[in-house]
């Protein structure tokens, strides 16, 4: 793959030539091939146009789901275990980047809440379901989507339950553990798939209740399935799961998002930065091992309750591809979001929110309010 070094140089040429990308641009996507190690971006200066440090708030501990963001710094970043941060130069762009872990480091609050509580944060991980729900109270705009399908799942012990659908889970009355504020749970309840009296928002990411009780629990197809079957000593047996995507909640998971004013105030920054994000994602997916190893090291340096393994991280990347969770998006390039798909979700999701008495969404919200493909480079492709 062309490295970030090459990608940044090509980007600089493209910007000089005035080749701006929009979500209606038609071009033949180019497949790139990964280098053996992460290379630093070269040829694009972000000095004076992007915040320095450029801070990204993620939604959880460092893991392959966030690898493309950590990969912008590379493997030589510095860990602050107390604050859950990873900091280093954003290649040769002239600025520093900091990636912040979520979960306990932000009080288990959604990244959108932290985004608006801390003005230092420039970008945050926000799924489009949450962005729709909070489009009035905490508005954000997605500029890059790593996921084509959300890896979010509900999982259970097949020795305790036999479920083929979300209706089955609801009919069983089984307790369902989830993180408070998760938009998908509002959807499942609002659509009548689960009942409000069977769900429990006290989940903190730990395995204890799943191991000791017969519960259904949220997780990621790219993480918890492998962890429970292979790494958690108290379990190490099969789990079954269903993708939330298959319930009709077809969100773009964990999109890299900015506040609406950044589309104008930081437009020059986004025009230069977002293609580097695309290239970082392609680089990671084509050669995941260096960053998978580093992510495992970071988790161990954080020394918290969350665990990881290189086997888990390598399996995660395989699941991303095998289950079609990560792929090129609209028009055949990475990061693009389909506005028709988002609008279709809005048409289903907003009435559910209204029925639940949730009033945080913008009246008349549409895809253009919460997402844009304007900053993407259509020549940067995974090739699958």
Model-derived regions: residue spans:
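C-terminal motif of bacterial Sec signal peptides marking the signal peptidase cleavage site
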Residues: 14-19
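Bacterial N-terminal signal peptides that target proteins for export
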Residues: 1-8
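Pocket-lining segment of extracytoplasmic ligand-binding domains
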Residues: 129-130, 204-208, 212-303
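Short, glycine-/small- and polar/acidic-enriched structural segments
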Residues: 40-202, 208, 215-218, 242
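Bacterial lipoprotein signal-peptidase II cleavage site
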Residues: 21-29
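Short, solvent-exposed loop/beta-turn-alpha elements that line the ligand-binding surface or hinge
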Residues: 77-93, 243-249, 264, 325-339
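Conserved C-terminal helix/tail region of periplasmic/extracytoplasmic solute-binding proteins
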Residues: 339-384
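Secondary-structure end/capping motifs
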Residues: 266-355
